[in-house]
Amino acid sequence: MLCERLIICGDSFSEGMSDQVINGKYRGWADRVADVMAQANPDFTYVNLAVRGKLVQQVIADQVPQAEKFITGKKTLVTFHAGANDALRPNYNPELVLPLYSDAVRKLAATGVTLMLFTVLERTGNAGKAADLWAARFHAFNENVRAVAQEVGAIVADANEESFFNDRRFLAFDRLHLNPMGHDRVAQAVLEKLELPSNPNWRKPLPPTRKTPWLRSKVNNVAWFLTFALPWLWRRARGKSSGDGRIAKYPEPISWPIN
């Protein structure tokens, strides 16, 4: 696909957490895709409206209207991914979130844009009651993504089709966001879906590794809880989000790559 403009809507996944930081911004899979698109088109422009922590209603209210202003036709690719943060909340209501998601997809598709959606990885190698609960929620969410994508003719990037993504080594230390290896794999999957140059070995699993010793595993669990889980719970208790006060990293069309 020869793309004239790439517009990204979403949350931390699309912002690029927790990839390498360049000029104060996470790189992420979307920047990597933009790199390849720019090589094929000197007039290519890029917009990334995604902000970490945003819920589906916030993405729809804040980002979709902005995206619509920048759509120029079929050669504009919009990626839309929202709702995973909702599903992580204790008060998650799928009867509210899923219709909101579907309506936003229909609204974007009606502009004539090329549209790409994403499923949520249902299993990331984590275990326990919380992991089981989230897997069930994400499964229902993904079924909705696939259904509305088929309805409007959107492209779907489905991580659950690739078993290697269950390897926790693609996750950052927070056990939630992708690390640089994970973002690179997502970028290659997106590029392949768009029939653009990609690494043909992107599906190759990581080599086997030794099991983490019991004591080190326990220390890692405590460090994770204190560093990530506890602050996350504290923000929820206060009604705060990691995205509060943040702005999109590229809120208007820019030539890419940045010189």
Identify the meaning behind each predicted range:
Residues 1-52, 64-74:
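Serine-esterase "nucleophile elbow" of acetyl-processing enzymes
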Residues 2, 151, 174-177, 181-259:
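Conserved catalytic region of serine esterases and O-acyltransferases that act on ester linkages
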Residues 15-17, 56-96, 122-123:
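Oxyanion-hole/transition-state-stabilizing segment in secreted/luminal serine hydrolases
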Residues 19-24, 92-95, 130-135, 172-173:
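Short glycine-enriched, charge-decorated loop/helix-capping segments at active-site entrances
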Residues 48-50, 119-120, 158-161:
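Residue-level recognition of beta-strand->loop/alpha-helix junctions
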Residues 78-81, 108-109, 115-117:
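Conserved, well-ordered alpha-helix/loop/beta-strand core segments that scaffold catalytic motifs
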Residues 94-102, 134-141:
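Charged helix-capping and loop-helix junction motifs
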Residues 125-159, 180:
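Substrate-gating cap/lid alpha-helix
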